[in-house]
């Protein structure tokens, strides 16, 4: 017995495989299907005893059977089994074997991984047809031996193994047994027909689907044991073991609907309900409705199966509808919930945004309120400061210094530290005023204005008595320290400012007395007038500074009150000045005297200029020293004043500092010159400032133009100066500005030159003007014009030389060895005429002069292959070898140049052959006699050429046709009749400029014993041809070659490159070629070329001398090319 696979075993293995978990190690018992037979526990104890006694033996025997691979060993080792030769077995032994088989199957499945149903698989209809029982020989006990299958785990699942068992005779009646045998394989058990029908239908469908797969897999040698189990075996098992289940509980099998769902969703496993009720998987009412009572006995199994399937389909459809409805409801609920959540999120976001916006609005409102309050405070402070500034300015101008006499020389007064921080104009004026004050004080009651710095005073009057004591009288209307500290830009207190002013004045009076000069008594009146002028100028200057700042503040505030405040400030200009006569100017008439004050300012400025010139002339050395020490004093003063900042400094000093920075231009001269020039410039700038302010109060542009010496012209028109001052200023300004002007004038000039030199056409550049010559452009233009004219005009001497060089390649000079070559051909080819006299009319029409394509011709050694001519084109091909073809009246020619040179330069006559002059007519009979030109005496109208041309052509055609019919072609002739390895170019009528000539340097072979040497004719284009090789080979007519070969005459080609026109040979239909460039390019095909006698000598018409020369050279000269042919073709 040989083990083989069975569909039942595969079905079981598939069931277990489906029940396996994902890891493949454990089996889900709920997923194992229930098979179609249900058993109850057996009550007989004898059968149970027999079953359990044989359990151990069956296990050991089955394992040994698997190990040895032979089923027959099982029967030999079992003592209860009879001989294999007997075919009769007892019923008891068969029953015991069946019990063992069931127990072995159960234990095997348990060992494999889980429980298995105890129901026996039914055989499908395909395998159940062969239901013949397997019986063996009867044993001594009368029992029969049968074989059953055991399922053993294998590499692909469970493997079925057939084991022989003893079958006991049935205990039931024969009628019952016959009824069961007559039934189908799908017959229902006796207990419950309905349930067994469903079980069988389901399991048969599974087994039948997998049976087809298993049958193709493993077939054994004996197909009889692997196809089916007998009906006898099935019925006996049903009868004997109907009540012996292997598993105590039953499992409900899957319905058809569940099976379809499993097919749709194979990964979803639905557990089966296991219960003790056998019919729990389906309601009996369904079966009662599906099967009518009257038809229960008459319906077949197939009909019942169909009805059940229809019912299951309906149920499945209903369940699908219900599930779809439920899914839709769930989806709607989920959507509603998601929408609700989104709405909540949106609401929360909106609420948060509203809160943020509210907070931002509140913050903005608070900031706006704070800003409004700040603006109000700033405006109020500005107003207060503006009023206080006016009062302080008016009070400062009313300060007087009392000096009783001039007898006591007092130290010269030097302006305080803060004055040096002011512009240089104020310092110079202050020094001059102090000199005047010290000299012009005659009376003790004389009150003079003390030029104390505006920023160092804080609304208090300083009075200097005769003892030089300083008293500080507080004013009731003066500002207090607390009021000043309220403003953001003002620091310090009133008392501090007063103390600072006092100490600064005292220190300056005691320390700086060197730079002042005391004038003589004679000049007292003059000094008094100047002092008055200076006082008024100083006051005007201070008033100007205060008025300027006030106007700027008023304009920035854009308040209507500013228009009312400016007139009140004009009262500051009216200062009470007390001279020695006691005359006092009224302070209240300021608005009425504005114009007078302006005129006084101009006059005072002129006087100041005169005075300054005198002082500078006298004290030049002292001023040099003072000017050199100005920077050191300024640094010290800055350090001292950084600690105290007066409110008036903020108002009045800052614009002056800006003015000083703008007008402070460095000088390139000696310090001594610089001191004098700076003083003049300072005077000039002050005058210009006063003039600009009087015209437009707050025009900063005009002010800057007047302050900057580079923006203003130093002419007398701008400043009202005296002639002396104009001359002195113009000289000093020119000396001071000239180096700068020279320096600045050089740099822009260099830039302009560089910039212009970047342009190619620039000729004004100082750098590139020498190199950029106009001759270059002219020579370039001449070159272009010459190139253009040369391309279109007639050829010059240079082009002639180029043409001569190109033509020399086309007409090379031949070696003298090849000039001596002779040609011998057969006697029958004495006279060869070219066919076709119909083209004679075309001779006189087209005349082409030589070397027409020499300019575009390729090199001499280039080669171009072509195919041999056909028989139809052979005549025209041979005619083209004799004479060049004439170009037809076609516009498609690409090789004719536009201009053909008619002569060659005489200087090149030694290197190149001289070309004949152009013919006046195409009917000339003779040409100039030249040794190196062929066909020199031939003409187009010679009688010998045209005589009997048609008759001879016809005769040659007849002879050639007869030879072709006779087939007399020697081996050597057809060898040379094939296309030669030498390249050629065929002549066609479409190629208008083709001229073929013999150029192959082949001579007679040296071995004269070979009588069958063949001529190889090659073609070459003349110098008119562009792109063909000079060495071109043409195939011959095979019949003509055979004629030439059978005559026994030797001949070969010639290869003299210098006298190509003298090399004309005919063989077969030998083509005659010429390189005479003077001939026209088209000749009639009927023109005979040469006459060859019986001895093989060539006689040319009108060229006997050349023939004699060729004959003399034939004996001596041999071509190297012929030697190469010997090597190629094996000639000896």
UniProtKB/Swiss-Prot annotation:
Q: How does it associate, per the subunit comment?
A: Component of eisosomes, large cytoplasmic protein assemblies that localize to specialized domains termed MCCs on the plasma membrane.
What keywords is this UniProt entry annotated with? Cell membrane, Isopeptide bond, Membrane, Phosphoprotein, Ubl conjugation
Q: Which GO terms describe its cellular component?
A: cell periphery; plasma membrane
Q: Is the keyword Lipid biosynthesis in the record?
A: no
Q: Which domain of life is it from?
A: Eukaryota
* Lineage, top ranks: Eukaryota, Fungi, Dikarya, Ascomycota, Saccharomycotina
Please give the name of this protein.
Eisosome protein SEG2
Main localization category: membrane
- Localization of this protein: Cell membrane
Q: Where is the signal peptide?
A: none
Residues bearing the modification Phosphoserine: 137, 280, 504, 507, 556, 980, 1022
Q: Which organism is it from?
A: Saccharomyces cerevisiae (strain ATCC 204508 / S288c) (Baker's yeast)
Give a short account of what the protein does. Likely plays only a minor role in eisosome assembly.
User: Which residues are listed as membrane-spanning?
Assistant: none
Miscellaneous section: Present with 538 molecules/cell in log phase SD medium.
Gene name on record? SEG2
| Membrane topology category | Peripheral membrane protein
Covalent link (Glycyl lysine isopeptide (Lys-Gly) (interchain with G-Cter in ubiquitin)) residue numbers: 526, 743
Sequence ranges of Basic and acidic residues compositional bias:
101-113, 208-225, 916-930
